[in-house]
Amino acid sequence: FLCFISSYSASVKGHTTGLSLNNDRLYKLTYSTEVFLDRGKGNLQDSVGYRISSNVDVALLWRSPDGDDNQLIQITMKDVNLENVNQQRGEKSIFKGKKSSQIIRKENLEAMQRPVLLHLIHGKIKEFYSYQNEPAAIENLKRGLASLFQMQLSSGTTNEVDISGDCKVTYQAHQDKVTKIKALDSCKIERAGFTTPHQVLGVTSKATSVTTYKIEDSFVVAVLSEEIRALRLNFLQSIAGKIVSRQKLELKTTEASVRLKPGKQVAAIIKAVDSKYTAIPIVGQVFQSKCKGCPSLSEHWQSIRKHLQPDNLSKAEAVRSFLAFIKHLRTAKKEEILQILKAENKEVLPQLVDAVTSAQTPDSLDAILDFLDFKSTESVILQERFLYACAFASHPDEELLRALISKFKGSFGSNDIRESVMIIIGALVRKLCQNQGCKLKGVIEAKKLILGGLEKAEKKEDIVMYLLALKNARLPEGIPLLLKYTETGEGPISHLAATTLQRYDVPFITDEVKKTMNRIYHQNRKIHEKTVRTTAAAIILKNNPSYMEVKNILLSIGELPKEMNKYMLSIVQDILRFETPASKMVRQVLKEMVAHNYDRFSKSGSSSAYTGYVERTSHSASTYSLDILYSGSGILRRSNLNIFQYIEKTPLHGIQVVIEAQGLEALIAATPDEGEENLDSYAGLSALLFDVQLRPVTFFNGYSDLMSKMLSASSDPMSVVKGLLLLIDHSQELQLQSGLKANMDVQGGLAIDITGAMEFSLWYRESKTRVKNRVSVLITGGITVDSSFVKAGLEIGAETEAGLEFISTVQFSQYPFLVCLQMDKEDVPYRQFETKYERLSTGRGYISRKRKESLIGGCEFPLHQENSDMCKVVFAPQPESSSSGWF
């Protein structure tokens, strides 16, 4: 009884269900739907958009004799008109001098003004009746109007089906007013779309819908509905846009109408009105506007290929052309794509392979797989570019993974490509699992392939390959195998297994894992290389270390090999200075004098670790870190450069470049460190890019290769990764409740070229390592709202070209040797642009463009003070020679 009273008091006076029309009355209303597009800032009058208005007649045709709440109503649009939402447009208005009938076209206007029938039961839409074969865009506008007549007069939450789909709605009733709040995120409707699942590279979208009804005499006097759709890129919030869509319905008058049609069955009534009426879904239907005068795929490619020449890849225009062509490829057929691939020359072909693979459609995948021959040694570069594009796929599917598994089981012309295929399979497993695809059959097969391969592998190369795949996949099931290889494997294998464990999230680093890492660091069972021990320590310190774990690590400083002492001391100081999660525990332990004393904290050496901010805002941060470990003889053992991007607490490992060297002590007649006496001469570079581990490259391997490089006194830069990457890829097709179709897209791409070199000169007693990273970045966002006869759009974007170089110089002509580390950033041009437009299907349009440019000065990133002092010595100005002599 109390529930009944509460429900009644919260409802509109005298009614507990939906709208009710009076018999024999024709309701005459005015209706308008308008849409505004902008970046979400400033006055709506600065927006682009349009308004569609009309008169509307509503009449009750039939009411069930069994109850007032079962009604059939007829809705008719009349006198349709188009106008600007921006009254200041004046002479620039696209509608000026044009009749609405000319713009909408005769057949569309006739369809729009044909009546629709709405069968309402208890205020909810039972069926929507219209004529077959009407244009979907026009039908949607009528669906948008008809959906406004669905409502209830009592408060409560329910599910309704209207033009937006099957949605959760909440009603709030107050005397003569009812407010309907639709949870747009809950709407079930089939629409194309995809997004980048990673928070850092993804977008945040918001959607709200509020409709207010003013009721008199059981019918609406006025309806105001507002739907807002907003979108912004998480890490660059200037890439943002908003759609405001409004509907207004207002009662002007009522007049006498035809009498109700008698009968018990609504179907008979509809047939009597017009037998051509048919029930169709009230949910909005998909339509595509035809592109007039658009180039073919081949014509588009010919117009942009000059921007994708190798010499032009450092420019943002290359990325712009790449992104635009991907959009076109997504509508292309396999035969069209293959034709272009087969006709292209070898200079531009790698960039074309990047684009075709990044399109991520069934046709583009079939085309590229038909084109590439993995048994050939002549197309290795193209095969590698295909695999890298797969690794960075924004929304990979199971078919792509299955294709790579199939290729892996076949034969290869290059063993490097075979390794890359397995490594990229690991990356795809990770991405699919992050997108709730871990139980897909293809993913399960890939997991078995990686774990089974690692368990059975006997050759060193195969073990490395499967470990690198696991480093990308990060399968929890692989942790026991990683522990085995870390603790019992030989040096390089042990180190790779440890760095693979290092990539796992905190919940997976269990007490068992940390016990193993402690045994390795403290060498309880066997002697390990410095690189393995320091990685084990990093895993402990990163994953909620206990008091005793931190204390034991601090107590070990002073008992370690000289350069490892300095390295671990730098790691601890960096933790304290940069406020990592372990900082609190380290400070607590340092209160003990046994751990915190001068002897322990005054160890000398050249190894170092430093972390700093590239940029920091209230919601995001970008950090860089550089740690370098030397052997006791002064030769580089490992350098590790990392750049992370954070959105709140979510990290993206943007770049990691690791240079490793071993077995070089014989060159300067030095004694190897403990546990490293039998290592082969080797130097190589390993890169991780946007959370994907790539196949490492080798500078030299073995003594003879080393001698040839050394006698040349230099090493040519080796390409680590080069290509065009699609990193940000978001596309939404939206059904606005007004009936208009909207699209929201964000794309981000970059052209990247990372090279590494190691120079070693016995003559000058000097070694240098260089890592150079050049990128061109373009991010674009686009929003359109289309009615099929008029379209409004907003495009925003940002672009830049940047370079970052890391140089490590070691002079070992004296002891202690001199070490200088440099991280240099070049001047960075930064450009932002905004385009707004309105366009008729007849071709007439309005366009507004804005552009802003700035230059961010280059700089050398600060490292620790000791490094700055050392660099002054290494690069001290040479004194001018005095001119003394015989002449």
Swiss-Prot record:
Coiled coil: none annotated. GO terms for biological process: cholesterol homeostasis; lipoprotein metabolic process; phospholipid transport; plasma lipoprotein particle assembly; protein secretion; triglyceride transport. It comes from the Eukaryota. SMART domains: LPD_N (SM00638). Residues 1-11 form the signal peptide. Disulfide bonds join 167-187. One of its GO terms (cellular component) is basolateral plasma membrane. The keyword Signal applies. This is Microsomal triglyceride transfer protein large subunit. The keyword Methyltransferase does not apply. Catalyzes the transport of triglyceride, cholesteryl ester, and phospholipid between phospholipid surfaces. Required for the assembly and secretion of plasma lipoproteins that contain apolipoprotein B. May be involved in regulating cholesteryl ester biosynthesis in cells that produce lipoproteins. PROSITE patterns: VITELLOGENIN. Keywords: Disulfide bond, Endoplasmic reticulum, Golgi apparatus, Lipid transport, Lipid-binding, Signal, Transport. Heterodimer; heterodimerizes with the protein disulfide isomerase (P4HB/PDI). Interacts with APOB. Interacts with PRAP1. It is found in: Endoplasmic reticulum; Golgi apparatus. The gene is MTTP. GO terms for molecular function: ceramide 1-phosphate transfer activity; cholesterol transfer activity; lipid binding; phosphatidylethanolamine transfer activity; phospholipid transporter activity; protein heterodimerization activity; triglyceride transfer activity. Residues 21-655 form the Vitellogenin domain.
